[in-house]
Amino acid sequence: MSLHTFGSGRLTAQVDSLGAQLRSLCLDDVEFLWNAADPWNWSAPVLFPLISGLPGDELQHNGQRYSIPSHGFARRSEWAVLEDGRFELAASEATRVQYPFEFRLQVGFTVTDRLTVTHEVHNDGDEPLPYLLGGHPAFRWPLPGATGEHEVSWSQGGESMRQAVGGLRPGRIPSPAIDGRLVLQKSYFAEDALLFDDLQPKAVTYTAPGAARLTLRYDDFAVLGIWSKSQGADFVCIEPWSGYPAPQGFDGDITMLPGIELLSAGQTHTFSYSIAIEGA
């Protein structure tokens, strides 16, 4: 593992080659990212080729079963560092015993007045590549300098949501957000993440009185998750996902998973999200 720094003026980011994981995001040397301490030892893992898990942690394909952990293997893998500063994870013996497909996943980090995280999924095989891809950045809660309630807000949508507890639950339920404003409470996360698929535009702002404003844009992603631990955790995750996790009780070939991306042989798909921080 090795740390790599990207910076432009006031904004700097550090990325670990282990997992291609964002480890630090600072504005004027003030840290806004969770420090990966207990009770959640991550800061911004890359979720691939799964989001959440499959029943029994087993992936099925062409009549075979493969053991694969929740959120996939990308976050626990050592990534190659390319000459242009991007990170790459490619199919190997270690991945094929979990996920029998030929792929390359490249992640780049660009810092201007915001951090942009770009993921390129390449299908190097001769059959469609099934996958889910997600970001999982965790931000400090409370934010530096905050003096009041924290909220995540957006312009339109979000009156209803979905949840995934042991798999994606069927149907929608009312959201605790009011008029595009979700005032954060730990109790909201007693049953895992709040999942939204209808926010327009695809951008949310996380802030509190006295604190900076963090705006996350996720135009290339279908779902946004908001999650924290319900107890003992000083962070909130704002997570862009390519799709929903497996529904409860799913028992089929990975290519039949509802919402799965199927990338044609030889093709590439790009997903980007950005984080902008405006000072208090």
Q: How would you name each of these model-derived features?
A:
Residues 1-30, 255, 276-280:
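Generic N-terminal segment detector
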Residues 59-66, 261-278:
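Short Pro-Gly-centered flexible turn/kink motifs
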Residues 64, 68-112:
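Extended, loop-rich substrate-binding clefts of extracytoplasmic carbohydrate-active enzymes
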Residues 93-139, 144:
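Acidic, contiguous internal or C-terminal segments within carbohydrate-active enzymes
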